Amino acid sequence: IILFNSDYNPQNEQEYLDVVRRYRVDGVLAVPIRETSAEWQEYVKKLDVPIVTVTRRAKGLDSVYVDHIQAGSMVASHLLEQGFRRFLFIGKDYDGKYVGFRQMLVQMGYGEQTANLVYQDDVQLKQALELWFRQASERGAVFAGNDIYALRVLDALRKLDVFIPKEVGVIGFDNTSTGRYLNPRLSSVSQPIAQMAQEAVTRLLDRIEHPGQWEVLDYPLSAELVLREST
């Protein structure tokens, strides 16, 4: 087993895929760092080894993943039910989580009250959150693309003396263990990691042991809201 961690760096990801090609491995479990592009999909197909993508869907490749669009929509519905009326997503606008989040809010009439912010550093985040918070009096909510971003949001809001969730709600994604020990404890979205891993490994071994023509596996799983005090 060869394990690579790209550290969310696209260049590292590309280099590690090149290593996979050189070492002629038997199979690959890939966890793409971003939404898979057509170019990425074509490149990994040329590796000429069985490959299963995990956590994100890749067209034309076996994929075991959580439907991020559905998860984002679910988060939006929850925040609306809690009385929030302005919304900020921390992450890229092409992230499936934001796509589903925004689609639901547009459908409910809150498209103009919804925006996204790409994280650069803690100073930029604090300044952007302060500007967003001061712009309007309506109660707002921040949906962070992962729990790490959510922790940074909570820290920035505390430094701005913003009351959570009375003035601003915060929800993350991944449901990491850290969120349970914060004050307030962090609401988040949980992915069925064990099930994803089991299905992906089973599929990869089948591909390795029984090569040939297979129908492409498209295996979406549902995420689950884990609600705590931050929303």
List the predicted regions and their residue ranges.
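Intrinsically disordered, low-complexity polar regions and short flexible loop motifs
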Residues: 28
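Bacterial carbohydrate/catabolite-sensing allosteric modules
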Residues: 11, 15-24, 37-39, 45-231
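Beta-alpha junction/loop-to-helix N-cap segments that form part of ligand/metal-binding clefts
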Residues: 31-36
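Helix-turn-helix/homeodomain-like alpha-helical modules used for DNA recognition
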Residues: 1-15
